[in-house]
Regions:
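NAD(P)+-binding Rossmann beta1-loop-alpha1 motif at the extreme N-terminus of oxidoreductases
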Residues: 1-47, 51
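Rossmann-like NAD(P)-binding element
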Residues: 39-77
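Solvent-exposed alpha-helices and their adjacent loops that cap or buttress functional pockets
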Residues: 45, 113-116, 209-214
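Rossmann-fold dinucleotide-binding core
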Residues: 56, 66-67, 75-77, 83-158, ...
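Interdomain hinge/lid region at the active-site interface
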Residues: 157-161, 171-233
């Protein structure tokens, strides 16, 4: 019998732990000790760790923290669910012999458990790493037991960029454009909704004129995620 370890019990880690613990022995770990179920950690202490699921925030100490967690739990594979700077997975892979997988998380934090099952869970691992094929198969099987669909990408950096460029940042730019178009509407004393109604049929037929609503760009990961690209000098 083996266990799963989820490191970081925040808005992503907690739902992932709840999801996994229904199909496998699993423990949660966090720097905030009040969030840890110490009895469960003791219960599964001697169980070897299959996957170490990383759900901690991305900081300058992110890689060092993962290396430390790897030494602590000695998993057969590391799975990163956090949003990270491009090439982070590869940098970590050079510092460990176990496969390091990236699996971007999609969903709204307040309904994350529901969204984890609604969206396909993309993942990627360097195919040249020893046991990469095993890791991909085992992760897919684990997610299947959790009733989560999976899809494998060719390499980690493609998925790292997809999460930032195609998901959160793209959403933020759409809202930014809505803010700009709203400013133009106000300056010219025209109705924002009436102006945008011109695009309704275009979007209906072509699907490429989405109307967003101006205002504060909510979601504490939308704007900060733009910084990840800058850090990587992409």
């Amino acid at each position: 019998m083996e266990k799963q370890v989820v490191a970081g019990l925040g808005e992503i880690g907690r739902p992932i732990l709840e999801l996994i613990m229904k199909v496998s022995p699993a423990i949660g770990y966090d720097i905030e000790e009040s969030l840890i179920d110490k009895e469960k950690i003791k219960k599964y202490e001697k169980y070897p760790t299959t996957f170490l699921h990383i759900c901690i925030p991305f900081t300058e100490k992110f890689i060092a923290n993962i290396i430390s967690l790897n030494k602590k739990f000695k998993p057969k594979c590391i799975v990163i669910h956090s949003t990270i700077s491009p090439n982070t997975t590869t940098k970590i892979q050079t510092q460990t012999d176990v496969p390091v997988m990236y699996s971007a998380t999609r969903g709204v934090h307040k309904r994350m458990l529901f969204d984890l099952r609604r969206y396909t869970k993309f993942f990627a691992v360097d195919p040249n790493v020893p046991n990469a094929t095993w890791a991909a198969k085992e992760f897919s099987n684990l997610m299947k037991k959790c009733k989560v669909k999976t899809k494998q990408m060719s390499n980690p950096i493609t998925l790292e960029l997809a999460k930032i460029v195609v998901d959160t940042s793209y959403y933020g730019w759409l809202i930014t454009y809505a803010q700009l178009s709203n400013m133009i509407a106000i300056q010219n004393n025209v109705n924002y909704d009436e102006m945008w109604s011109f695009a309704d049929e275009i979007h209906k037929f072509l699907g490429n004129r989405p109307k967003m609503f101006p205002g504060f760009i909510g979601g504490h990961c939308v704007i900060p995620n733009l910084d990840q690209i800058g850090r990587a000098h992409v």
